[in-house]
């Protein structure tokens, strides 16, 4: 007996898992993990499945993290939020705004659960989670021991954290602590936000602008399955960026604190005239080249073949090799996404 994963991944790819367990508290989560381990089965914890591509049937247990709850503690200079890992991220952003606690508005409409946000160090429109993260509460899967990691201990990087490295498969995130400063500073560095006046802008206006940009440019997973940005924006050494800018002076580029330069993957893909290109049922989205969609009952093989095609075309034209932001899940767990599409 297997269970379809189609409802549990926003790509809408039809693979199955041996077991699917919905965990509403820590004990259920630990029990499901320990049961699978006793049976010698692989086990993975999933939020809303908005950043994964299942490559094949999963041979083990998928645990859906549904630990809920939001607690707010106000101090003189900040609001401190303690949020269950199974809460929906966008609903949290709305909750904070509705209660006059700004600071999350640039991250509106990012799909997925709160517990996934530190794994990827989610970011959009100039703000990353690390800017507001205070701590992450996890439970050690083998021992059931509680751990609280400070933001520094999470080792946040660009779409990266300790949870994608040493702590992968070792801990389950059960809650995230956020600190929203009362000295709100709007971040207006990207897209339509640059048109807003920092002196008069409200957090609600930033939220509305972000929602407008996302809904007009990004496909709704309920209509066309997708996992948001498929590729990371490449971060390259300064000399490589200089070389590229000599050939393409209008290429969007964002110098980083360490001297490297972040390029816009969507722009690179667009320059290769790849919008609308299809392989099987998978397609490059016509409005936002960074998004690959399930246009017509795509298989995971279609998506992988399309990602490979996009990577090759961009690499040949720019000598910049894109890496997936989406996590690839094989029969026994996560596999190397770059190798899968190389």
Swiss-Prot record:
Cofactors: FAD
Pathway field: Cell wall biogenesis; peptidoglycan biosynthesis
Primary location: cytoplasm
EC annotation from Swiss-Prot or TrEMBL: 1.3.1.98
Domain FAD-binding PCMH-type, first and last residues per copy: 13-183
GO biological process: cell division; cell wall organization; peptidoglycan biosynthetic process; regulation of cell shape
Enzyme class per UniProt: oxidoreductase
Catalytic-site annotation from UniProt: 159, 229 (proton donor), 325
Pfam families (alphabetical): FAD_binding_4, MurB_C
Top-level division of the source organism's lineage: Bacteria
GO molecular function: FAD binding; UDP-N-acetylmuramate dehydrogenase activity
The UniProt record lists the keyword Cell cycle: yes
Gene Ontology annotations for the cellular component aspect, listed alphabetically: cytosol
Keywords: Cell cycle, Cell division, Cell shape, Cell wall biogenesis/degradation, Cytoplasm, FAD, Flavoprotein, NADP, Oxidoreductase, Peptidoglycan synthesis
Localization (cell): Cytoplasm
Catalysed reaction equations from the record: UDP-N-acetyl-alpha-D-muramate + NADP(+) = UDP-N-acetyl-3-O-(1-carboxyvinyl)-alpha-D-glucosamine + NADPH + H(+)
PROSITE patterns from the UniProt entry: FAD_PCMH (PS51387)
Family, per entry: Belongs to the MurB family.
Entry-linked NCBIfam families: murB, PRK00046.1
Name of the protein described by the UniProt record: UDP-N-acetylenolpyruvoylglucosamine reductase
Gene field: murB
């Amino acid at each position: 007996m297997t269970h379809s994963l189609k409802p549990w991944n926003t790509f809408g790819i039809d693979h199955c898992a041996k077991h699917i367990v919905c965990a509403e508290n820590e004990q259920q989560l630990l029990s499901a993990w320990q049961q699978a381990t006793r049976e010698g089965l692989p086990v993975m914890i999933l939020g809303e499945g908005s950043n994964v591509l299942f490559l094949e049937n999963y041979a083990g247990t998928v645990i859906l993290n549904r630990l809920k709850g939001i607690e707010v503690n106000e101090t003189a200079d900040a609001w401190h939020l303690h949020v269950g890992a199974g809460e929906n991220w966008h609903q949290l952003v709305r909750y904070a705004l509705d209660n006059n606690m700004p600071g999350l508005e640039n991250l509106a409409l990012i799909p997925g659960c709160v517990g996934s946000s530190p794994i990827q160090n989610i970011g959009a429109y100039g703000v990353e989670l690390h800017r507001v993260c205070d701590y992450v509460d996890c439970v050690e899967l083998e021992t059931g021991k509680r751990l609280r990691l400070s933001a520094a201990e999470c080792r946040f990087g660009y779409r990266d954290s300790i949870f994608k490295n040493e702590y992968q498969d070792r801990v389950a995130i059960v809650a995230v602590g956020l600190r929203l400063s009362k000295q709100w500073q709007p971040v207006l560095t990207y897209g339509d936000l640059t048109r807003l006046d920092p002196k008069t802008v409200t957090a609600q206006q930033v939220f509305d602008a972000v929602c407008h940009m996302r809904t007009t440019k990004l496909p709704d997973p309920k209509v066309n399955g997708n996992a948001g940005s498929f590729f990371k924006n490449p971060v390259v050494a300064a000399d490589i960026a200089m070389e590229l800018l000599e050939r393409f002076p209008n290429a969007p580029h964002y110098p980083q604190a360490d001297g490297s330069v972040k390029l816009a993957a969507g722009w690179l893909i667009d320059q290769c005239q790849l919008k609308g290109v299809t392989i099987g049922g998978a397609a490059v989205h016509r409005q936002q080249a960074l998004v690959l969609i399930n246009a017509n009952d795509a298989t995971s093989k279609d998506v992988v073949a399309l990602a490979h095609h996009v990577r090759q075309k961009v690499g040949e034209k720019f000598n910049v090799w894109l890496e997936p932001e989406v996590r690839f899940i094989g029969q026994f767990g996560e596999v190397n996404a770059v190798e899968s599409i190389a």
